[in-house]
Swiss-Prot record:
Subcellular location(s) of the protein: Cytoplasm
Motif ('KMSKS' region): 228-232
GO biological process: tyrosyl-tRNA aminoacylation
Name of the protein: Tyrosine--tRNA ligase
InterPro entries: aa-tRNA-synth_I_CS, aa-tRNA-synth_Ic, Rossmann-like_a/b/a_fold, S4_RNA-bd_sf, SYY-like_C, Tyr-tRNA-ligase, Tyr-tRNA-ligase_bac-type, Tyr-tRNA-ligase_bac_1
Positions that bind ATP: K231
UniProt-annotated binding residues for L-tyrosine: Y35, Y168, Q172
CDD domains cross-referenced by the UniProt entry: S4, TyrRS_core
Pfam families referenced in this protein's UniProt entry, alphabetically: SYY_C-terminal, tRNA-synt_1b
Biological source species: Clostridium botulinum (strain Langeland / NCTC 10281 / Type F)
Motif ('HIGH' region): 40-49
Keyword Isomerase included in the entry's annotation: no
Enzyme Commission number(s) from the entry: 6.1.1.1
């Protein structure tokens, strides 16, 4: 059986490692327990979490045991990583509800039967901590000077960082120590923005337990321009079908930029790498076949094959239908130079709306859709990324469609 380290490396997940050679050897010869933390700030996971789920699934397939740690305790503080402002604190009831939602979504691709994976809540040990004992046992091992050099704190020093949030690194380090003691968990995984927190936990275990512990971070899911993927005009791309419909989910991946197809196929599908390379090598109009495969595979993983099939059929009926279907749709033609302008200007130019004020009114009412994504930004600029193989699709309300073709 191939080493899962090599699979993760080939598919491009790995960003940073604490001990590269040791980790590769460990994953090849032993079955380990590892953990990834999830911050329960919403009642659904989103596409950013999906990458972490994929890593967990690859590791589990290789015989390793995932521990999904939900931050019911740390969630009451808030992780300052990547944030410019302090987060709103949540109630215990909110956190518990969100934890239950997470497990259902994780179970789509992670097997929780017979302890093959477990979910734990750090509230179980953090909420009963004795503050003096915690400072004596844990706080003594953390250098404030070193903590202040961590990226997650640097960006907050000028705007203000509360003592509450400053404790977050200690809490996360303590989580790793607890999981090591209770479940022999020897590795923490996370997005690259968690690197400083992961290092803190690895160092704490080595100091407290005189044992080896390891950390690995993986790349964030970004597009070719370096922006995080999974954001739509109406917000995050959620895994909950009530928040983001399977059709919207499918359409998002169907319309990714050509330059992002290969990365997405590698990171968020289980397609063999030979197939990923074949699909990624398609050029011109053929790349749309790769996008259809990507959209179907990702939607199937999250929403099941039946919903993926429905989304595919619905998309083909509207967007990829035969010429007769598209010919019946009101169509306006624009020049490539007309792109990179405000959507409201384009809608008036194409005579879809008589005035910009009417277009803005429908946006305000929540009834205007661009490529089946609700438009919420009055100042949305239409770029080449919005152009699908059949043009730019505009929907007003539920059934009024227009097509803009770029010549």
């Amino acid at each position: 059986m191939s080493n899962v380290y090599d699979i993760l490396k080939e598919r491009g997940y790995i960003k940073q490692l604490t001990h590269e050679e040791e980790i590769r050897e460990l994953l090849g010869k032993e079955k380990i327990s590892f953990y990834i933390g999830f911050d329960p700030t919403a009642d659904s996971l989103h596409v950013g979490h999906f990458l972490q789920m994929m890593v967990m699934a690859h590791m589990q397939k290789a015989g390793h045991r995932p521990i999904a740690l939900v931050g019911g305790g740390t969630g009451m503080i808030g992780d300052p990583t990547g944030k410019t402002d302090m987060r709103k604190m949540m109630t215990k009831e909110q956190i518990e509800h969100n934890c239950n939602c997470f497990k259902k979504q994780l179970a789509k691709i992670i097997d929780f039967s017979e302890d093959k994976a477990i979910m734990v809540n750090n509230a179980d040990w953090l909420l009963n901590l004795n503050y003096i004992e915690f400072l004596r046992e844990i706080g003594v091992h953390f250098s404030v000077n070193k903590m202040l050099t961590a990226e997650c704190f640097k960006s907050r020093l000028e705007k203000g960082l509360s003592f509450l949030e400053f404790n977050y690194m200690l809490m996360q380090g303590y989580d790793f120590l607890e999981l090591n003691r209770k479940y022999n968990c020897v590795m923490e995984l996370g997005g690259d923005d968690q690197w400083s927190n992961i290092l803190a936990g690895v160092d704490l275990i080595r100091r407290k337990e005189s044992k080896s512990a390891y950390g690995m971070t993986f790349t964030l899911l970004t597009n070719s321009e370096g922006k995080k993927m999974g954001k739509t005009e109406s917000g995050a791309l959620w895994l909950d079908p009530e928040k983001t419909s399977p059709y919207e989910f499918y359409q998002y991946w169907r319309n990714v930029a050509d330059a992002d197809v290969e990365k997405c196929l590698r990171l968020i599908t289980f397609l063999p790498m030979d197939e990923v390379r074949r699909l990624s090598s398609l050029e011109g109009a053929e790349i749309n076949e790769a996008k259809k495969v990507l959209a179907f595979e990702v939607t199937k993983l999250i929403h099941g094959e039946e919903e993926a099939q429905k989304a595919k059929i619905a998309a083909e009926a509207l967007f990829g239908g035969n010429a007769k279907d598209l010919g019946n749709m009101p169509t306006a033609y624009i020049d490539k130079n007309d792109l990179n302008n405000l959507l409201v200007d384009l809608l008036v130019k194409c005579e879809i709306f008589p005035s910009k004020s009417e277009a803005r009114r429908l946006i305000k009412q929540g009834g205007l859709y661009l490529n089946d994504e609700k438009v919420t930004d009055m100042n949305l600029v239409v770029t080449e990324e919005h152009v699908t193989e059949d043009g730019i699709m505009i929907r007003r309300g539920k059934k009024n469609f227009n097509r803009i073709v770029v010549e």
